[in-house]
């Protein structure tokens, strides 16, 4: 359960923004979307490998 303490006199939009930020960090929506369809393990492994290669290339460019 996400708890966002609201200080007295604090704007409700600011509190809502804090809530949204905390909610995004939990990854609930991302996991829900991932569970809507089944992906074969071989496809997941391939995507994971491709992402690792992409990240490696980005790190090499930075250096």
UniProtKB/Swiss-Prot annotation:
Which molecular-function annotations from GO does this UniProt entry contain? structural constituent of ribosome
Q: Name one Pfam family in it.
A: Ribosomal_S21
**Domain of life where this protein originates:** Bacteria
What is one GO cellular-component annotation here? ribonucleoprotein complex
The family database entries (InterPro entries) matched by this protein are listed as:
Ribosomal_bS21, Ribosomal_bS21_sf
Write out the entry's keywords from A to Z.
Ribonucleoprotein, Ribosomal protein
Gene Ontology biological process terms, A to Z: translation
The record's HAMAP family line, in alphabetical order, gives: Ribosomal_bS21
Q: Which family does it belong to?
A: Belongs to the bacterial ribosomal protein bS21 family.
Q: What is this protein called?
A: Small ribosomal subunit protein bS21
Q: Which organism is it from?
A: Phocaeicola vulgatus (strain ATCC 8482 / DSM 1447 / JCM 5826 / CCUG 4940 / NBRC 14291 / NCTC 11154) (Bacteroides vulgatus)
């Amino acid at each position: 359960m996400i708890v966002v303490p609201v200080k007295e006199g604090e704007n409700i939009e600011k509190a809502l923004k804090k809530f949204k930020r905390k909610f995004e960090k939990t990854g609930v929506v991302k996991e829900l979307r991932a569970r809507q369809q089944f992906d074969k393990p071989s496809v997941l492994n391939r995507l994971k490998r491709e992402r690792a290669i992409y990240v490696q290339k980005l790190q090499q460019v930075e250096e």
